[in-house]
Structures are given as C-alpha cells and as structure tokens.
Amino acid sequence: MKLPSVASLLIRVYRTTGPVSHIQRIRHGAVLNKNYSSVSAVKNCTALLYRNHGEPSQVVQLESLDLPQVGAECVLVKMLAAPINPSDLNMLQGTYAILPELPAVGGNEGVAQVMEVGDKVKTLKVGDWVIPKDAGIGTWRTAAVLKADDLVTLPKDIPVLSAATLGVNPCTAYRMLTDFEELKAGDTVIQNAANSGVGQAVIQIAAAKGIHTINVIRDRPDLRQLSDRLTAMGATHVITEETLRRPEMKELFKSCPRPKLALNGVGGKSATELLRHLQSGGSLVTYGGMAKQPVTVPVSALIFKDVRVRGFWVTQWKRDNRHDDEALRHMLDELCILIRAGKLSAPICTQVQLQDFRKALENAMKPYVSTKQVFVM
C-alpha cells in the first residue's frame, strides 16, 4: 500500500481548528517571528523530525512544518530551551518503553512561553512559562500548538536552563527521595551514576535536607575534577566503582550510617554492590540501566537483610497522578524553592542551535559526558 506523502498529511492535519490530538501534538509544531508582534502572520515552524528508528544523529532531520490554528482549548507556545536526555536517545533508537507514531518530533522535556491562548483556556495566559506534563509532546522545535491541559506553569524568576531541565531528572530525584523511605537529616543514600542529571539532582536535594550521599562514579581521566564538582554540589562522599568493592568501605561507614536507600541507574554488578551496603530493611530503587545488564539480587540480601527491590519511572508517576494537579504542583513548587535558594542548579549545559543537531546528538552519545546538550530557540 502506498503511504501518503508528509506534505499531504500536513495539509489534512492542519485543516482542523479543534483540539490537537495526541498524534498531531507529536508530529507538528509552530514558530513565531523574532519580534513576536504578530502571531497571525506566522505560517510554519522548524522542528527536528524522525521517520524511522536508528542512530540518533542519522535518523533526525531539520524540517519546516506548517502551523495549525489555535483551537479553543489549545495554546500556541514558543519553545525557549529543550535538552537531550538519555530517554530521548532511546526513543530515537526505538528501544524506549513508549514510542510515538512516526513521523515524530524528538524531545520530551523543555520550557516554552505561551504566546496565544484559545477561547476556552482558563488555566494559562500569554507570557506564562510552561513545561509538558507528560512525555511524547516533541520539544525539539521552535514552537507548537498544544492542549492547555497538557502543560503546567513554572515561575519566570528561575533560570531558563533550570526550567528546561526540571521536568525529568529533578522530578525523578525528588520522588525517589520521597516515596520509598522516610528519610530524615543524618540518614544516608547511596547511588551510582552520580554524575548523571538524576544523580546531580539527588546530591543537591539530599544536601538541602541534611541527608548524606555516597556517590559512585566510573573511573575516568577527569576523575578529580568531577569529584570536586560533585562535592561542591553537596556530595558527602564520591567514590569509584572499584572503591565500592574494597574493604575500605568499612572506614567510610564510620563517618555516616549505612544507607537506607540505594538508587540504581546502571544495573549489573554496580547494582549488586549497592545492595551489599544497604542497611537491613533498606530499599534499592532502579530508575535506569546504562550498563544494559540485569539487576542480580543475592538471596542473602533478601533473607537476612529483608531488602526491598523497586523500580521507578517518572513518566508513569505523572500518568498515575494525571488528575492530581496538586501533587505535581507541590513537587514543582518545592523544587523551584530550592532553585531560588541556590540549592538546586541545572547540570552543566552546552547550548546549541537546532541546526547544529547532529553534533549535539553525537556529543550526547559519547561516554564520560558530564555536560548536557540543550537546544535553545
């Protein structure tokens, strides 16, 4: 069967004036003139589109897409900044748990500014900063027409890069520190992938609460520099995977109690080592698997220490709490308080233009990367 061309698909999609469907949201977007003086004069947008799965830098293309009319329950937003996260790369590769219908616009996170609102929109106004409530909207574009109910506001007095990177990693860190163990000041959390976006957020949020963190990173050429940077963020201890397996860990636990909570973003042997150091009744929470190896739980840890092994996916949490606006609002407000107080900062970011997407995607795929690639529009 012959598939319709993208051009004909766009023509059919943009004839609608009603609410934008889920598939329309993923595929298409909008753009504004640089002076933002006339929305009606704008006819198209620029977006990073992919039609099949594969090597991220090869399947993505920079394209111009038409601008749909703003429906009564929709808003026109200009994207300000949108990061490249590991989950975005997994979507491009076709290995993520949820995959949009193709063709799709890349990116699941970012901050935008509302430029026009539909007649029935009461929750948003022109000028508001907003981030997506859920994954799949497609944030790597200059602008979009989206349903107002799919967005949540952020205060405009926080840095743009903090806003752009708030919805995934800090939210993941916040929920894992809140939902699995009743942590109090003086308690300990141990984590691998400590230099990741989630890991950095864990360090800072825990430090703000007086919670010790033992932070495990891979050995690398810039080990001392990275260790110093994580320590400056509030890390109590920064150690390598090799140190985690050595007897001197006993000395470390003289300065802080054994952890109640272990956060695993790696899997494999690294996760097993985290389990080994948990106190009795503690929890191992897995949120990632960069090693692409299964989590192996020793029988002794289950029998003699009664450890709990759990998983966490922030996308599922947001979907489970889709109708609980207060829960999402409270979490975002708490994180913004930390940002304003200088206790939670965005990861080190490299700002890139959309047209430089190939280099940005290639850099995001490199090992030992300590900076996040962020598209700025």
Curated annotation (Swiss-Prot):
EC number(s): the record gives 1.3.1.104
Keyword Nucleotide-binding on entry: no
GO annotation (BP), single: fatty acid biosynthetic process
Binding positions for NADP(+)?
A: 169, 195-198, 218-220, 287-290, 312-314, 372
User: What species does this protein belong to?
Assistant: Danio rerio
Its localization reads: Mitochondrion
- InterPro entries of this UniProt entry? ADH-like_C (IPR013149), ADH-like_N (IPR013154), GroES-like_sf (IPR011032), Mito_Enoyl-ACP_Reductase (IPR051034), NAD(P)-bd_dom_sf (IPR036291), PKS_ER (IPR020843)
* Record's keyword terms, sorted: Fatty acid biosynthesis, Fatty acid metabolism, Lipid biosynthesis, Lipid metabolism, Mitochondrion, NADP, Oxidoreductase, Transit peptide
Q: How does it assemble?
A: Homodimer.
The UniProt entry's sequence similarity note says: Belongs to the zinc-containing alcohol dehydrogenase family. Quinone oxidoreductase subfamily.
UniProt entry tagged with the keyword Oxidoreductase: yes
The Swiss-Prot or TrEMBL record annotates one GO molecular function as: enoyl-[acyl-carrier-protein] reductase (NADPH) activity
GO cellular component, alphabetical, reads: mitochondrion
**Transit peptide located at which residues?**
1-52
Q: Which residues are responsible for catalysis? A: 96 (proton donor)
Q: What does this protein do?
A: Catalyzes the NADPH-dependent reduction of trans-2-enoyl thioesters in mitochondrial fatty acid synthesis (fatty acid synthesis type II). Fatty acid chain elongation in mitochondria uses acyl carrier protein (ACP) as an acyl group carrier, but the enzyme accepts both ACP and CoA thioesters as substrates in vitro. May provide the octanoyl chain used for lipoic acid biosynthesis, regulating protein lipoylation and mitochondrial respiratory activity. Involved in iron homeostasis; affecting Fe-S cluster assembly and ceramide metabolism.
Q: What is this protein called?
A: Enoyl-[acyl-carrier-protein] reductase, mitochondrial
Q: Which SMART domains match?
A: PKS_ER
Gene name of the record:
mecr
Which chemical reaction does it catalyze?
a 2,3-saturated acyl-[ACP] + NADP(+) = a (2E)-enoyl-[ACP] + NADPH + H(+)
Assign the protein's first listed, main location to one coarse class. mitochondrion
Q: Which domain of life is it from?
A: Eukaryota
Q: Which Pfam families does this UniProt record tie to the protein?
A: ADH_N, ADH_zinc_N
